[in-house]
Regions:
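Conserved structural motif at the start of ABC-family nucleotide-binding domains
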Residues: 3-5, 18
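The feature captures the beta-strand-to-loop junction immediately N-terminal to the Walker
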Residues: 34-36
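Helical segment within the ABC ATPase nucleotide-binding domain
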Residues: 165-177
Length: 227
């Protein structure tokens, strides 16, 4: 089992933003966290990657893989850096914490990431010169450093135009063939196109948790779960 969460709660001030969250996600699943804005999706993801703590110790109620890649909704890119320079910086940072690599291996890792996410033609540019779609590819490449077992993507297609949207969705589908992916979205079509399973969250509670193959009408299911 890639992810196991048991009875997780989170308060922010007096607001109970996550209520008794329980879920199990298997290896190789692509799971969509679907819900309206403010439902608790991003909060759950931040707890999973260790940015925030749950009310009780996360060690007792979250069992996660050792390696996790994370793409936050507001992707912090250093726009003055070149694409290769940016990725090399994060390879140095990440690999220092995980294991030692020689300069040659680090360079090879950067080139593999660039090729994997389709950045070859843009790799010589500064990050700030890239379109929104290519910036998301840079963010995905950063999240994949170290070949993580689990990839957590918070609203990965926000702000993309229709062509960029389809490109990033196709890329995430490809990435999801050999690892577990959890992505958050409020777009139903996104879940239909990319996910094998949907978890609908509203007001901090899981309302629906089903394989997509068991859902005949996602729109109706979503409406009924979020009334």
């Amino acid at each position: 089992m890639a992810v196991e969460i048991n009875h997780l709660n989170k308060h922010i001030g007096k607001q109970h933003v996550l209520r008794d969250i329980c879920l199990s996600i298997g290896d190789g699943e692509v799971v969509g966290l679907l819900g309206p804005n403010g439902a608790g999706k991003s909060t759950l993801m931040k707890i999973m990657v260790g940015v925030w703590d749950a009310d009780s110790s996360p060690v007792t109620n979250c069992h996660l893989p050792k390696t996790i890649g994370y793409l936050p909704e507001l992707n912090p890119l250093y726009e003055e850096m070149y694409v290769r320079e940016y990725l090399r910086f994060f390879v140095e940072l990440r690999m220092k914490a995980m294991r030692r690599l020689g300069d040659k291996e680090k360079g090879e890792m950067v080139e593999q990431l660039i090729e994997r996410v389709g950045l070859t033609a843009e790799a010589h540019k500064r990050v700030g010169q890239l379109s929104k779609g290519y910036k998301q590819r840079v963010g995905l490449a950063q999240a994949m450093i170290g070949d993580p077992e689990l990839l957590i993507l918070d609203e990965p297609t926000t702000g993309l135009d229709p062509n960029q949207l389809e490109d990033i969705r196709a890329l995430i589908r490809e990435i999801g063939k050999d690892r577990t992916v959890i992505l958050s979205t409020h777009i139903l079509q996104e879940v239909k196109q990319m996910c094998s399973r949907v978890i609908i969250i509203d007001h901090g509670e899981i309302k629906v948790d089903k394989p997509m193959s068991e859902i005949e009408d996602l729109e109706q299911t979503f409406r009924e779960a979020t009334v």
